[in-house]
């Protein structure tokens, strides 16, 4: 099932048409195809329901989920270096002279092309959820680079995608710091036992607290000394636990058992019905969480 593990959240900066029927055709033009013999990497769209459906989009209640797959050829540097050195040595022996740097650089490209067809592939998939009701796009990944790559693929598929990272009116780290300092988060949220604190100075230290009482004197002292909270583990209404980061991303989402088991009455053999029910449940909960979070963090920055 598609329960998201992380959320990189983006705001559509202006209204655009995002209808699943249109998107289906647009994504099909950039459907995933495997790497050819000389490709280092390929990225494209695959059905979010895997082998259970050919559709590249799945939609329910104005929520759309899509899935990008990436194939990357793995060529370890030592392998390239060894093959290159062997080729250079062979040519220098044959020609009885030292090769120039430009010649060596050209040889490196030749070596890469000769090794590529034999290289192993690494595959990864990234889910993306488009909330057309609230004008948000969420990417299930932990790095901004991966999220931007997936958004770039969608932008290329649609022709236009005006999005910006979701940002708050007040710096997130200052709000998180105040929550820890006061020992109380915004309504609906509860502090857990994990945080990261950073000094505002460039060469200042980083403190990572795990399984620790965040209201303790030790943590308070770090804040008084000028450190700010850049990551904070939170519980939302005893339904979802996550780590809030100062860049606006949510990491390590953990849905409570009660939530995950809510659709257990649906026959697991009926994959499509279960997928649909879980998708509706997950997006409904996460949309409410995001809205609560925006309010709790002091509101979204004016655009």
UniProtKB/Swiss-Prot annotation:
Cross-referenced InterPro entries: RdgC
Gene Ontology terms describing biological process: DNA recombination; regulation of DNA recombination
Name the record gives this protein: Recombination-associated protein RdgC
Entry's Gene Ontology molecular function annotations: double-stranded DNA binding; single-stranded DNA binding
A Pfam family of this chain: RdgC
CC per GO annotation: bacterial nucleoid; cytosol
Entries under NCBIfam families matching the protein: PRK00321.1-1 (NF001460), PRK00321.1-3 (NF001462), PRK00321.1-5 (NF001464)
Stated role: May be involved in recombination. Genetic interactions among priB, dam, lexA, nagC, polA, rdgB, rdgB, rep and uup link the PriA-PriB replication restart pathway to DNA double-strand break repair.
Compartment annotation: Cytoplasm, Nucleoid
TM annotation in the entry: none
Membership in a protein family: Belongs to the RdgC family.
Source organism superkingdom: Bacteria
Effect of disrupting the coding gene: A double deletion with priB is disadvantageous to cells, which accumulate DNA double-strand breaks.
UniProt keyword terms in alphabetical order: Cytoplasm, DNA recombination
Keyword Ribosomal protein: no
């Amino acid at each position: 099932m598609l329960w998201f593990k992380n959320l990189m959240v983006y705001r559509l900066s202006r209204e655009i048409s995002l209808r699943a029927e249109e998107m289906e055709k647009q994504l099909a033009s950039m459907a995933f195809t495997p790497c050819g013999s000389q490709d280092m990497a390929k990225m494209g769209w695959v059905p979010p329901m895997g082998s259970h459906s050919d559709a590249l989009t799945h939609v329910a209640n104005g929520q759309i989920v899509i899935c990008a797959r990436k194939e990357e050829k793995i060529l370890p540097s030592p392998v390239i270096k060894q093959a290159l050195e062997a080729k250079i040595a062979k040519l220098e022996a044959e020609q009885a002279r030292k090769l120039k740097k430009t010649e060596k650089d050209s040889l490196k490209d030749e070596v890469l092309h000769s090794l590529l067809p034999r290289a192993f592939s690494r595959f990864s998939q990234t889910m993306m959820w488009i909330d057309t009701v609230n004008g948000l796009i969420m990417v299930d990944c932990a790095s901004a680079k991966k999220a931007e790559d997936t958004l770039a693929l969608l932008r290329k598929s649609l022709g236009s995608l005006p999005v910006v990272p979701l940002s708050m009116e007040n710096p997130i780290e200052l709000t998180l710091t105040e929550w820890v300092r006061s020992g109380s988060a915004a309504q609906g949220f509860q502090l857990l036992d994990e945080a990261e604190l950073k000094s505002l100075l460039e060469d200042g230290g980083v403190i990572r607290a795990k399984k620790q009482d965040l209201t303790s004197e030790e943590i308070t002292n770090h804040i008084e000394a000028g450190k700010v909270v850049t990551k904070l583990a939170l519980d939302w209404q005893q339904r979802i636990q996550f780590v809030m980061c100062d860049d606006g991303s949510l990491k390590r989402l953990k849905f409570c058992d009660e939530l995950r088991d809510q659709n257990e009455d649906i026959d697991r053999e009926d994959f499509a019905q279960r997928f649909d029910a879980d998708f509706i449940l997950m997006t409904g909960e996460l949309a409410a969480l995001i809205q609560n979070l925006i309010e709790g963090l002091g509101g979204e920055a004016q655009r």
